[in-house]
Amino acid sequence: MNRFFNRELSWLAFNTRVLNEAKDESLPLLERLKFLAIYDTNLDEFYMIRVAGLKQLYEHKIASKGIDGASPEEQLEKIKHYLAHEIEERELEFQKIQALLFKKGLCITPYNELNLEQKAKAKTYFKEQLYALVLPFKLDSSHTFPPLANLTFALFARIKDKETQIISYALIKLPSFIFRFVELEKGLFVLAEEIVEAHLEELFLEHEILDCMAFRVTCDADIAITEDEAHDYADLMSKSLRKRNQGEIVRLQTQKGSQELLKTLLASLRSFQTHSYKKHKLTGMHIYKSAIMLNLGDLWELVNHSDFKALKSPNFTPKIHPHFNENDLFKSIEKQDLLLFHPYESFEPVIDLIEQAASDPATLSIKMTLYRVGKHSPIVKALIEAASKIQVSVLVELKARFDEESNLHWAKALERAGALVVYGVFKLKVHAKMLLITKKTDNQLRHFTHLSTGNYNPLSAKVYTDVSFFSAKNEIANDIIKLFHSLLTSSATNSALETLFMAPKQIKPKIIELIQNEMNHQQEGYIILKANALVDSEIIEWLYQASQKGVKIDLIIRGICCLKPQVKGLSENIRVYSIVGKYLEHARIYYFKHENIYFSSADLMPRNLERRVELLIPATNPKIAHKLLHILEIQLKDTLKRYELNSKGRYIKVSNPNDPLNSQDYFEKQALKTF
């Protein structure tokens, strides 16, 4: 018997749970639409990275197998088989929601169903907003198929010259920055590509449009960087980003159009060359023909529309923790260690802390790591302001996938402001989230530390659940000072801390030691691990051994879980759960009954434990330990948004009509009640 679930199929099962939220009829319609958008965006990234990686292994005949022993070719086939039915489910769900939205006055209307007045408005919109932006290409001997960047959205048409009757083909690129949903009248939307298609004869004069189809390509978007050869890491990353759009096509999505047109499109894709003059390899490319609009990720335009509040979930306003109501946040932290649970407790104190430090003459230095900060960052702006007055040192991780460009921009801005900027660490990704502020008061140095499971990003802090920790304890500050020094001197691989634990050297051995300690207590042992993913085979094997010793183990794993629970003789004392709700579960909390409770930036994956700089923080304060355990206990009682994984790999929704509990709603209400 195989002891592990396949990683890729486990991820797909997570995305299925996201799709299930779109099917939840108790949710407002635009909330359901939001989950369809998330589903598609997730799947885009899965193809750009995971499927692209498997395709590379297969094409280069690299003998690499998944944790379950499946070859790249087998995994690609399993992925295609898994998605074949689910893509149809997604389309049906969109059509159901679309029909319900129509009844509520939000109409996504096909162009051919518009009346004459509405078509006249569409024509005006085409002339004023689209005509100058679309890129039409007639494909002939002097105009070959142009390069297609990752996530290119385009139309492919068969056209006939009215004079010569010669049939040829045309490509019309639609830029990503145009509005996809064009509101012709209040509540009446038409897709931009349908407006363009209806006016193709204005782009190809003296031609008749015979057939047309919309299509979208997904390409390999992983960035390969040879760090050994890097003299200027920022410059190397900048050049690598420019190559991202030149990756091989891994997926083709098409909408309507004849089979003949699809065959011609495929032949055209096979013949064209990229900027690097390497032909695209379409071997094993996944092709999906859609009955609905392509790229449901663009549904965010409707979800965020200001006119349909009645169709959305009410906005929750994060509450300010009462200990942070004082004007001087540093005094609050000196009084006691504090732990916030975002988004229920506001992220604002984190921003305020940096802003207060920047304006306080007593502040000597600010040290910080930045992983994903977003395009508009008040935190970076505060650091830029501080850099003109005090010592500011920032490690900006340029290898944060899909945030590389934003991080590079902020790193350059910080450098221009006078901050010391470090661009990551050689062969390691810095994923630890930490802030250290040093002040001088009463002729003494005082250190203030903030550590978090989530990013320094106010926007994600409103939709991700994370915990963040504030402390003025010297033993914690000393470890963070040591860690920052190791990052600046590129010695993080071999560094070890005293109070905290860091990867790649300490976290995995510590977690194994904690599991072994619970094994010593056999049936009295109890472990709860809450993480985004559980993939590390060594940790899974130790959990199996603990189960066989009688230790009760509850795992709350939001996404990928390669461990097989409830298998007789192997894991019958292990139960695996997953919570998917309106907030993305992101906090990592690790509880060991006979030792302590910890929170961490690290998931239980080889990449986090062996190839990243991460932190594991023990909750030595009883109040904080109790708060963390309470989070776990409530989530284990969730009967509305919790799934249980069975031994066959299926996720079954937990239900108890007599005791309905949505853990995320519970924490919202608790925040309102407490504050």
UniProtKB/Swiss-Prot annotation:
Where along the chain is Mg(2+) bound? R372, R401
Concerning CDD domains, the annotation shows:
PLDc_PaPPK1_C1_like, PLDc_PaPPK1_C2_like
Q: Known EC number(s)?
A: 2.7.4.1
Summarize what the UniProt record says about post-translational modification: An intermediate of this reaction is the autophosphorylated ppk in which a phosphate is covalently linked to a histidine residue through a N-P bond.
Pfam families for the chain: PP_kinase, PP_kinase_C, PP_kinase_C_1, PP_kinase_N
Enzyme active site? H431 (phosphohistidine intermediate)
| Record GO biological process | polyphosphate biosynthetic process
Gene3D superfamilies on file: Endonuclease Chain A, Polyphosphate kinase middle domain, Polyphosphate kinase N-terminal domain
Q: What does this protein do?
A: Catalyzes the reversible transfer of the terminal phosphate of ATP to form a long-chain polyphosphate (polyP).
Family of this protein = Belongs to the polyphosphate kinase 1 (PPK1) family.
- The protein's name: Polyphosphate kinase
